[in-house]
A protein has these predicted regions:
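Conserved GNAT acetyl-CoA-binding A-motif
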Residues: 112-127
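Conserved beta-strand in the GNAT
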Residues: 53, 59-70, 83
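Conserved acetyl-CoA-binding loop-helix of GNAT-fold acetyltransferases
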Residues: 95-114
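Short amphipathic alpha-helix that is part of the acyltransferase structural core
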Residues: 1-46, 51-53, 198-202
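Conserved acetyl-CoA binding element of GNAT-fold acetyltransferases
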Residues: 75-98
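Non-catalytic, surface beta->alpha helical segment in thiol-disulfide oxidoreductase systems
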Residues: 244-275
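Local sequence-structure signature of Cys/Sec-based thiol-disulfide redox active-site neighborhoods
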Residues: 172-209
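Conserved active-site alpha-helix within GNAT-family acetyltransferase domains
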Residues: 127-148
Length: 276
């Protein structure tokens, strides 16, 4: 039986693979309150978010979400268009060819679903082989209209002569407290993603457990809505950025215990530290 798609709504939110009980979370340990992910989806659906849930042999395996640009929680200006928010196929490794093939089919279904109502679809792609890959989106006729490495703003017009989307001007300015002998950590997160909820909680735990906690100033910024995305725009990928004393840290630069080690290293190198 081929994969079937059903419209996303509040009745089938429990079928989303990234919500509590979903396939993406199975067998993994997460920290933080993951029911926030369900609450985020409920709120965005009320604002006009659309989506499709993919079922393989009646088992929920994936989803794709998009929203009108004027409510989409990304720093993208695209009057009359929609914005691709998230897509994921669970149960395979990202490097598995089936993974990207199924994600491609889901996006194709979303494009067909959005084609009549909107002037086009904007998306953010990454210069990365499996994480929102630019190559995958370009295979679906998206074209690059702006770049903020490693992220590209991509555009698929549904009509001739429609206005291209643009990235909003960055509004957020990260802090640098080195002169005071303090490590400023500015971090964005969002309840839209269980990994983001988990990472934000893990960062809080790392900072609270540091022996020189008073030398760390952690500020976390929750970006769930369009207004928050505009006000706190620092990177196009507006809910995954981290700055250490003003230095932007790549989403993939550190993982696991390496964050603890990197923060300890930076605190030790601050002015006034015995190790500096």
């Amino acid at each position: 039986m081929p994969v079937q798609y059903r419209p996303l709504n509040e009745a089938n939110l429990t079928d989303l693979v990234c919500c509590p009980g979903g396939l993406e979370l199975a067998g993994k340990e997460f920290t933080g309150r993951l029911n926030r992910v369900t609450e985020w989806h409920q709120a965005r659906l009320r604002e006009g978010m659309r989506g499709l849930v993919a079922y393989d042999q009646k088992t929920p395996r994936g989803f794709v979400e998009y929203a009108p640009a004027d409510v989409a929680p990304f720093p993208i200006e695209a009057p009359g268009a929609c914005v691709l928010l998230c897509f994921h196929w669970a149960g395979t490794q990202p490097e598995d060819p089936q993974h990207l093939a199924e994600e491609r089919r889901m996006i194709e279904a979303a494009i067909a679903d959005a084609h009549q109502e909107f002037t086009g679809m904007a998306a953010l792609g990454w210069n990365h082989p499996t994480h929102y890959p630019i190559v995958l989106l370009c295979e679906l006729a998206f074209r690059e209209v702006a770049r903020d490495e490693p992220i590209a703003l991509l555009w698929l017009p549904f009509r001739d002569g429609v206005e291209e989307p643009t990235l909003a001007r960055p509004q957020f300015r990260p802090r640098d407290l080195r002169a005071r002998g303090v490590l400023a950590i500015d971090q964005a997160w969002s309840a839209r993603c269980p990994y983001s909820v988990h990472f934000a909680e893990r960062m809080r735990n790392v900072v609270s457990a540091h022996p020189d906690r008073e030398r760390i100033d952690l500020r976390q910024y929750r970006i769930d809505t369009r207004g928050e995305a505009e006000r706190l725009a620092a990177s196009p990928w507006d809910w995954g950025w981290t700055y250490l004393n003003g230095e932007e840290i790549s989403l993939f630069q550190y993982g696991g215990d390496t964050w603890r080690e990197e923060i300890a290293r930076r605190v030790a190198s601050l002015p006034g530290s015995s190790a500096a």
